Amino acid sequence: MGSMCIAMAPRTLLLLIGCQLALGFNEPLNVVSHLSDDWFLFGDSRSDCSYVENNGHPAFDWLDLPQELCHSGKISAKSGNSLFKSFHFTDWYNYTGEGDQVIFYEGVNFSPSHGFKCLAEGDNKRWMGNKARFYALVYKKMAYYRSLSFVNVSYSYGGKAKPTAICKDNTLTLNNPTFISKESNYVDYYYESDANFTLEGCDEFIVPLCVFNGHSRGSSSDPANKYYMDSQMYYNMDTGVFYGFNSTLDVGNTAQNPGLDLTCIYYALTPGNYKAVSLEYLLTIPSKAICLRKPKRFMPVQVVDSRWNNAKHSDNMTAVACQTPYCLFRNTSSGYNGSTHDVHHGGFHFRKLLSGLLYNVSCIAQQGAFFYNNVSSQWPVLGYGQCPTAANIEFIAPVCLYDPLPVILLGVLLGIAVLIIVFLLFYFMTDSGVRLHEA
């Protein structure tokens, strides 16, 4: 159909316009896809083929991922997990993958339905904010890097106090960052403490810097039973750069004054020697980091909406985190409705959305994927690849530069058509005048 439109364009501009507008040719597909075979997907149970194969779900009805991709080597997924959950907690999976075009379909396994709070009177909304900030940095950085993996971070602490698991609930225990207990020779938490850690082996490291966002009560060994304001920082000993912040809210961990919980900011740090410093309350040190390697030319990541069926409470933090130009968000117009296994897996519309992984496309854009690169009923917004209506599209942040040649050619054709029409009108008018004169 596209070849016919191009072949007929010199004969009539109207047919070309008809192909583009009236027929809606080459409309963007609401799928997640890729420009080449150099792609990778990070997922959870909806793309965890190993879980399906080991548990014998018939016809792979558990998955949203096309079954044909199960042994492609392009998937890193774990049932019941997510990048955020693995980054912060003891229940983790070693997500590892590499590709030019990176796709994320995970995140739902840490949501309001789990209701995680550090403390009894904590605030799950704080953790939703942490989740959004975490994914925002991951998405942005993976638009510039090929490889993502997890690494452990070792530290050196000069005191005698040991790590403490202060932040946990019935199912999850936080171990990133690591909390160092109060030294026994201090009667309260009003003292400065520090520890050294080294980041090496990656181009950049994503690490958390977290503080309790209010007034923290001291331990039972604190005779004054005081409240403390948390203050943490990281200091790059090679460059002299500080990263840090203090708690600012008037909240606590009591029924009368609830809301005390961890607020985390995420930094992409370069390799080097660092010092973690606490000016008051507990010293925290990163124990895990996301390792970013192999810089690449800019390529936006694609994120598929990760949510439960309406029977469970979901959040939209991955959508909040996925911002253009470095991230393109994919969603469906309907809720998640699972098929034969349960309501949370094997959703028809999400299977259709992920079916685009079975083939390459010419262009990915904000509206979706364009299969052809010649003409389209819609001009690609933030397009990347060989996009329709342009011979070449390159991203120079944040402006798309379109090749003007097709537009120039259309203008030339329009000019020629006008000249031909004028010539024919003049010819027939002259010919009619001659015939009338002869008659």
UniProtKB/Swiss-Prot annotation:
It is a single-pass type I membrane protein. The chain crosses the membrane at residues 408-428. Residues 282-395 are annotated as: Esterase domain 2. One of its GO terms (biological process) is fusion of virus membrane with host plasma membrane. One of its GO terms (cellular component) is membrane. Residues 12-132 are annotated as: Esterase domain 1. It catalyses: N-acetyl-9-O-acetylneuraminate + H2O = N-acetylneuraminate + acetate + H(+); N-acetyl-4-O-acetylneuraminate + H2O = N-acetylneuraminate + acetate + H(+). Residues 133-281 are annotated as: Receptor binding. The active site is at residues 45, 342, 345. Homodimer; disulfide-linked. Forms a complex with the M protein in the pre-Golgi. Associates then with S-M complex to form a ternary complex S-M-HE. Belongs to the influenza type C/coronaviruses hemagglutinin-esterase family. Structural protein that makes short spikes at the surface of the virus. Contains receptor binding and receptor-destroying activities. Mediates de-O-acetylation of N-acetyl-4-O-acetylneuraminic acid, which is probably the receptor determinant recognized by the virus on the surface of erythrocytes and susceptible cells. This receptor-destroying activity is important for virus release as it probably helps preventing self-aggregation and ensures the efficient spread of the progeny virus from cell to cell. This is Hemagglutinin-esterase. It comes from Puffinosis coronavirus (PV).
